Amino acid sequence: MIWTKKKALSLFAVISVVIGMGMLSGFSSSDSLSSTPTSEKADLVIYGKIFTSEGNQIVEAFAVKDGKYVYVGDKAGAEAFVEEGKTEVIDYSGKGLVMPSCGNGHAHYSMAYAINTVGTVLEMTDHVDKFFNEIVPAAVKKAKETGATIVYGHGWDQMIYPKDLNYRKKLDAICSDIPIFFSDEEGHKGVANTNLLVKAGIMKADGTPLKTDIRGGEVVLDAHGIPTGYLKEQAGTYVRSFIDNEKLFSVDIAKQNMASIQEQLLKEGYTMYLDGWANYFFNENFYKAAHEMDQAGNMHFVLGTAYEIESWMDVDAVLAKAADCKKYASTRVKPNWIKLFMDGTVESGTGFVDPLYPDGHQGISNWSEDELTGMTRKANAKGITMHVHVMGNKGVTRIVNAFVNGGKDEMRNTLVHVYKADAADFQRMADHHIYVTSGMLWHHVTDEAQALYMRDHPEGMKDKGYPMKSFFDYGINVSSHTDYPAVSASPDDPFGVMEITQTGDYHAEVGKPWWTEECITREQALYALTLGVAKQMFLENERGSIKAGKYADFLLVNKDVLTCPVKEIHEAKPAATYFEGKKVFSM
């Protein structure tokens, strides 16, 4: 689902040579829907250095009419579309770069804003003593004052919180009469009190264990076989499903959050994103809110939604629900994906790998190959694309097998994150049009974490993780994503991510550059941020590049990220964001 990679560190990638398209430099003066000179006049004309994301093409100008590009080429050609007093003309020459607006191939803005609204969000620096002495008591007080039926929160750091602590007892000492649940920063772990564990049938109130074997997860037990309240992977989501989610996350709350999500996206330069867990609260309220927002004409981005299937669920029943959510489809809402977890994360030792971890374990595998193959076949037959979290190379092989044997190549079934992949699997991805939304933002690691990786990671993964360049080399369509809010000490904005793809380093931390052989070019990074996402979301004929006939979704960036010093790329921001020809954000 969500946040995978606890890359308390991390990275990203994109494309240099676009297979099948000649890479163009310089200008094209004839990308126009009408001949020049023309009697058609534009609503908007832009001059400047314009990166189109069509190959490496740079042009001087474009014209926009009724929300779409009608001309892309040189300045002289664009001038014919100007009607004095009616056409808005912006000369952005020398001020930065004009480029297509960006996309985020996998994120959880819906969940992030919901938790901010209904729960408590921790800082990564909040230590375990502060959690129990300040954060949880304050959250309980707030819940009781507002009449809430759950104390809910997110964001503790599983890398530093002890795993052998009895969280259940410590939470019970603070509050035992209403359920408590806090997920970790990745969303792969959770802690709960006795009240919630009893509701979920994990144990009796007297401590007697009941259902402690949850497929795809682990209910951690103490020396006496009694749950400690620490829940790994899908054991956490199973327990969380017993919360009163309809009350916790209503349609009204979802509607409120949509406006905040849009504000953040447009400010950062995103006008399309795929939400990796749209049914996070086990209901359809986010779908309903998005559909209503678009119907009201207030939506200034394109939303893709993935319906999550956990390995403890009835797959056929959930597939039917996911297919039914297509009723919420609209111009800017695309409910066309299902999401599932193949494994956990390599950083936490739950990624499914080969060779084994130094202590001899292999990680978590949530699905057999036969199950994945059957699910892929059923989903693709319903017109639903697979969107699968996978980190370890053994998990990648299993999913690629399933996509090849059960899927339709034209469905663009997608791997999400990918810490490690084997050479044979790269080639099969290319051969079968399997897409990747890459954890490029995590292609950096602190010096402290690098030392831990050398100790704890399998061979071949100690100093290498999150490939980027290899996807381009094999001709695999790759997009960028941030997994927000599970950014794991990494940036969410596109230009922060872009700098990491160039350097293997994150400006805000201390660490040797990470696996620089897999760094990519600036043009490749921009492709992954723009047209790569549009292709992943089946939008490339409408969006993702500056081309006549497409919607005019673009950015005026305050820095030329193609030529500025590489260590300054992260400073770039959108001076303005345009969606369908209209300015929807400006600094």
Task: Tell where the protein language model's regions lie, with residue ranges.
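Divalent metal-binding segments
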Residues: 27, 36-47, 54-320, 340-395, ...
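Active-site neighborhood of phospho(di)ester-bond hydrolases with catalytic His/Asp-centered motifs
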Residues: 99-105, 416-417, 479-483
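Conserved, mostly hydrophobic/aromatic
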Residues: 193, 269, 335, 344, ...
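Non-cysteine beta-strand/loop elements that form the S-adenosyl-L-methionine
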Residues: 108, 330-350, 434-444, 503
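Active-site microenvironment of metallo-dependent hydrolases
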Residues: 2-3, 7, 21, 29-75, ...
